[in-house]
Amino acid sequence: MKRSMYAGAVRSEHIGQELTLKGWVARRRDLGGLIFIDLRDREGIVQLVINPKTASNTVVKSAESLRSEYVIEVTGMIVERDQANDNLPTGCVEMQVTQLTILNASQTPPFEIKDKIEANDDTRLRYRYLDLRRPEMLKNFKLRAKVTHVIRNYLDDLDFIDVETPMLAKSTPEGARDYLVPSRMSRGHFYALPQSPQITKQLLMNAGFDRYYQIVKCFRDEDLRGDRQPEFTQVDLETSFLSEQEIQEITERLIACVMKEVKGIELQLPLPQISYDTAMNNYGSDKPDTRFEMTLQDLTDLVKNIDFKVFSQAPAVKAIVAKNAANSYSRKAIDKLTDIVKPFGAKGLAWVKYNDGKIGGPIAKFLTTIEDELIERLQLEANDLVFFVADDLEIANGSLGALRNHLAKELNLIDHSKFNFLWVVDWPMFEWSEEENRYTSAHHPFTLPQEDTVAELEGDLSKVRAVAYDIVLNGYELGGGSLRINQRETQERMFKALGFTKESAQKQFGFLLEAMDYGFPPHGGLALGLDRFVMLLAGKENIREVIAFPKNNKASDPMTQAPSLVSDKQLDELYLQVNKNAVKNNEQE
């Protein structure tokens, strides 16, 4: 029979109607001669009642055989419940079942289908189709669908054109590692799955499309964490003839539209902006979480003459103050915090506690000559705990920034109801790679340099600034963009600064350079991480919660066992050989 409606959509206005519902058995209970069944579908749960006095023997026997996750079809009259369940939207009604058909049986699930999951991540991914039945997961994907709907409507109204760009692209050396796809037709040649549609969307601007967007899959072979997946989705934008400010305004209004439609929150526009240098110096991060205070304080000038060489001879000495936290941390607990700063290069973590009008701790005796000024500058109050890092400025900023975020979580300083957006602007064009012993692009090699620093492309690369902008939400990089280079001469200078020879630049990017000979307009754009945005809107801490079939931390799918070995025949067709020892070693790990 045709389904009348979703089970979770039945309400008091349906009392007296005979309906047909279909879904899964969430629970079955036998009470006082009656059989009660919670029927679940994507909209929720409704209670079914099978009364042996009014239902046929066939219906009763079928009901007695039901187990969790059986798929059933039921028909019956909607009546008012004797005792309403205020925890359910359907809690004031129930169905008196007159017909019941088992559409499919189910084995006992490896975990109970409920919001408070009691399974580890790999088990959830191994049975993802069951995990996705949980109401919490369905809620996440309804949210995601609404977000994408709002985004498309907003961009369509602004005359952006939705264009699909190639999934089989050319591998380029900049950025993260590519996922490579061998070509059967061109022996020994490979496509790359795109890390972003960066170059193709720029070429669309050269084609005169003026405003492009795409909600697009991207791929990066990089180390994974809670906000990264090997394949992810971004909202990709590109425009012609617009300034940096105009692109930011379009983006802000897009985000404000999503926040209003999805969360009912009115954003105050324009969003705040801080420079990259300010972000690093004040928060120790290029994606600062501004939902709490605890900014970094520069004490380099204050300690330069004290009799403590660790401080006085350090290039930079910076501190953070954990307010009213001294009693929360024993010396042993503080020692463990060293593990937070060491990965950022810090050689140690110094600290003092402030109580009874004076500071105390392992280094307090070295600070007596500046104690009063230190207390005044840091605005210390009773029970405050101060942490110091003395090192190069970059190390001091990065390590204290990580500690700042760690302490905020431990001390419950974060207001999780807040959505704090801000722009980080005035970025360096290049960043130094210790691993490669050279400068690399902070964003990508197509970013337009700021006009007053472009001469440094042949000089001090650390002084080159980019017309680039990142949008940050609650300590996460939500997206980033820039104005792009549209002059061939500037693009060639950029490639040269990055270490490309003229020949290698032509080999990798000759098609782009050639396009710049044909009236390439000024252009710029931005990409927003859709998975990350939805994760934050849903209040989750891992983007796996908002991706239907994600990979685990080893970039594997426990359900399908991807990636997998392929047959020798498939490899032969692609003229490939596999290192058997590498495969054996990988299987043993």
From Swiss-Prot:
NCBIfam families documented for this protein: aspS_bact (TIGR00459), PRK00476.1 (NF001750)
Localization (cell): Cytoplasm
Keywords: Aminoacyl-tRNA synthetase, ATP-binding, Cytoplasm, Ligase, Nucleotide-binding, Protein biosynthesis
Primary localization: cytoplasm
Taxonomic source organism: Streptococcus mutans serotype c (strain ATCC 700610 / UA159)
InterPro entries: Aa-tRNA-synt_II, aa-tRNA-synth_II, aa-tRNA-synth_II/BPL/LPL, Asp-tRNA-ligase_1, Asp-tRNA-ligase_1_N, Asp/Asn-tRNA-synth_IIb, AspRS_core, GAD-like_sf
Protein EC: 6.1.1.12
Catalytic activity: tRNA(Asp) + L-aspartate + ATP = L-aspartyl-tRNA(Asp) + AMP + diphosphate
Gene Ontology CC annotations of this record: cytoplasm
One GO MF term attached to the UniProt entry: transferase activity
Sites where the protein binds L-aspartate: 174, 220, 443, 484
Stretches the record annotates as Aspartate: 198-201
Protein name, entry field: Aspartate--tRNA ligase 2
